[in-house]
Amino acid sequence: MNRSLLFITAVMMLSSCAGPRAASQKTTAEGILNRTGKSVEPDTASTNSSLPPGMDLRQPLSPDDAVEIAIWKNPQLRADLATIGLAEADLIDAGLLRNPRLDMLIPVGAKPFELLLSFPVEVFWQRPRRIAASQQALDQLAQSLIQNGINTERDARWAHADVVQALDRAAVAKQSAELRERVSKLTEVRLRAGDISELETIAAKTESASAGEQLIRFEHDVQLATERLRAVLGVASERPSLRVNSSPPPAEAPSPMEALLEKAMERRPDLRAAELAIATATKRAGWERSRVLLLSAQLSSKEVGTNGVLTGPGVSFELPVFNRNQGLVARADAEVEVASRQYVALKQRIAFEVAEAREQLVQELDALKTVREQVLPPLQRAVALAEDQYKKGDVAYLFVLEQNRGLIDSQLRVVDSEAAIRRAHAQLERSVGSRY
């Protein structure tokens, strides 16, 4: 009896000592910091509305400022990080032991007293596999959350670029409106002098009104882009006036495709998560196979006539005749195959994302260079000459209007190309998994 009690006690102590390793929210936040260079707000922060140290929403925000605030405060990222607590709870549950079972039969009439203590022995081969599967799932989730942090960085840079683009488009539209207003006034002067017909004056007024309407739309676009930036930063409920710094977009050409793809395969957290998904499914398949046999050690005490209470060991197990856990084993094997195929699909998607982002960046860099060096200078010269000739009465208003329209369209192309470069640069960083 003493040996049996000692055996069961030793099993319980040894099983409870093998604690799992947990990847906490703190370590996941450190992973985001390593990839983005920005910190997640610690759980010890005083209020949820705090900003990163040194940040002030009343000051103009650079793209890096926007990323720092978004990583710190973005509510969806913080909600995603909170889910790691669920995986940690699953890991804790995987390490718990099934409680011993005590059956006691009360002596009634001629029936003797009987006591039966059962302890699940299958813990020796099931618990390590269960813990390993839960640990892999936790690590997989941690890598996925690091990828969410990288996505948040990309979204912040996109939102910042949208605000800069909206502001620049509004500035170009303002110049266009002022120019058309000036031309409209010139036509009125020439009409009074009898140099042109009233029809040209009406056309000039119409163009001036259209330019004013376009300016109003672009100014509303500024407000819409600012609200999107607020949402990404996590300050949608706070109403300070947001301002942004409009710095030139990166002008350097990206690295060769082979180098970017190699770095992406090495650095992408979601690819690492896909690898861990295969390991998780494999561990789970091993765990499901270990559940075929359920074995319990028993300690039985029974009153036997005049001999008093006799105690002795025993075993109890299920006979795997009908149910050998075939369904869950087959499901676990299928999960391994699914995870493997998803891993291959993700590698293909990463290769496409890197190639697409790089090609977009190169395309917009080339387009911006062409417009700036070959399109804008002659248009600016043509507009200046056309306005001078119109004042002298040598050309018609429509000629001036066409020259100005071409210049405004080219200036908008510059603004759009600069914004596209900022977005493509952010997307390429996200596709690679870090700064490239």
Go through each PLM region and give its residues:
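Terminal intrinsically disordered/low-complexity segments used for targeting and assembly
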Residues: M1-W72, E219-K263, E429-Y436
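Short segments within alpha-helical structural elements
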Residues: E181, S210-S237, Q342, K347, ...
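Periplasmic alpha-helical coiled-coil/stalk elements that build and connect Gram-negative outer-membrane
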Residues: Q143, Q147-K263, A357-Q360, E364, ...
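Outer-membrane beta-barrel proteins
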Residues: P128, E198, G308-L310, R324-Q326, ...
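Amphipathic alpha-helical coiled-coil scaffold segments and their short linker/junction regions
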Residues: D56, P63-I71, A133, I196, ...
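A small-residue-enriched
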Residues: A18-T36, E68-V123, T226-V235, L261-G327, ...
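Short, charged, amphipathic alpha-helical segments
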Residues: L81, Q135, E198-T206, Y397-R405
